[in-house]
């Protein structure tokens, strides 16, 4: 059986999105829980791939759906395009999550006549790992560096932005930024016990920025 690659994952995601958008599903009729819809799509997509490809499946230890490819699948409604992900380190907000995202953005339509639901996949977007940092955080840091900012400026900025780090860690992160300036991120990441990821900007910018790819778009 063929080994799954990132290119194949994106190709199959486009095919899956088109098929799912015209599939009437009785199990989802009347379901309003976004998590249930997300689980449905993730499991169905994984089973679809297993028919054709070999790949390492994610588990609670790896924390992502395709650990062999360093890709996690996210499913979100167009009405509120966001989801959560595990908080590992405050550095993720600056340097990225450490893995890429494959995001399915759907609009759920219930049909009361035949009591089915259709998940109209409006956008499927691939965000490469280096673009998964927070937009405003990375833009501010890159502006500081462009204007001859130093370690003190970076620490003050992180404090102003309420990055969840103590003074020592802020100094370590500032040193790392000076050694390895971050790329511009495109997610909006809110501080919480889990990161809250918001996808409005990647939906807007898909296909216009390096590392943010339009895998599928449903043209009405």
UniProtKB/Swiss-Prot annotation:
EC number assigned by the record: 3.1.21.4
Reactions accelerated catalytically: Endonucleolytic cleavage of DNA to give specific double-stranded fragments with terminal 5'-phosphates
Entry keyword set: Endonuclease, Hydrolase, Nuclease, Restriction system
Gene Ontology MF terms: type II site-specific deoxyribonuclease activity
Biological process according to GO: DNA restriction-modification system
Function: A P subtype restriction enzyme that recognizes the double-stranded sequence 5'-TTCGAA-3' and cleaves after T-2.
Protein name: Type II restriction enzyme NspV
Source organism: Nostoc sp. (strain ATCC 29411 / PCC 7524)
Phylogenetic classification of the source organism: Bacteria, Bacillati, Cyanobacteriota, Cyanophyceae, Nostocales
This protein's encoding gene: nspVR
